[in-house]
Amino acid sequence: GLNDLPAVIRADVGISVENATEAVRESANVILMKKDLNVLEEGVLEGREAFANMLKYIKITATSNFGNICAIVAASVLLPFFPMTSIQLLLLNLLYDILCLILPWDHVDADLLTKPLEWSGRTLGKFMTFFGPVSSLFDLLTFVFLYFVLCPGVCGGSFGSLSAEKQSLFISMFQTGWFLESMWTQVLILQLLRTKQLPLIQSRPGRMVTGVTILGIVLFTLLPVTPVGKMLGMTAMPPVYFLFLVIDVIAYLLLVTLAKAFYIKKNQDLI
């Protein structure tokens, strides 16, 4: 009633019910459609869950982009060609963005819901500059393998000694190799950094996140052997490349896991 109006106005969060007087409803921040305070708890938890998933997206995406930018800058200086075409980069980002679009349906660890999370640009910068170079390190390792081992072995010599036709194959194979490595690491790092616990064991992602992750990896791994892949300048990779890819990705995930444990120990939290 009207006797509650002063209290509702002075409260940090004024709460009213649907059938209250018009003045009280207009002054309230929250209007309950039914007389049940459990609705407030559910709303708070939903808000914290949405905010936690938003923080995951921002921090992990910024980290991935930072690592890729560092690798592209280094490759542009050291290599006689671009490490990836612009359309390939856009396609890679499209896959990653599609995967991130389903993050709102991801599971959130219970410890993230016990208290409100805070947004801080300082922690974003710390997170990005800590994990980003790890990604760049394995990108550079992939560059070395592709430029000095795989591509010369398949094409029959170093890049400068090849004919124009062989150089075109060299470039296509290099770009395809880095595209696949970047896709695998970007997609899987999302699984590692979405939780401070052991992923897939102590903290399982939502079914939709898992499904899109697996589907994206399968489709984009097969892309180079399809007509669409050839239109994008890609080429089929030899079996030895996939052996390297598996070893590279496993080593990357292990190093990120160790780095994550160190980061949590130093900062008491991940997200």
Predicted regions and their residues:
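Membrane-embedded transport module
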Residues: 1, 11, 16-198
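Conserved cytosolic catalytic loops of P-type ATPases
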Residues: 4-5
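Basic, alpha-helical nucleic-acid-binding regions used in initiation and control of genome expression
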Residues: 8
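C-terminal transmembrane module of polytopic membrane proteins
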Residues: 93, 147-151, 155, 169-271
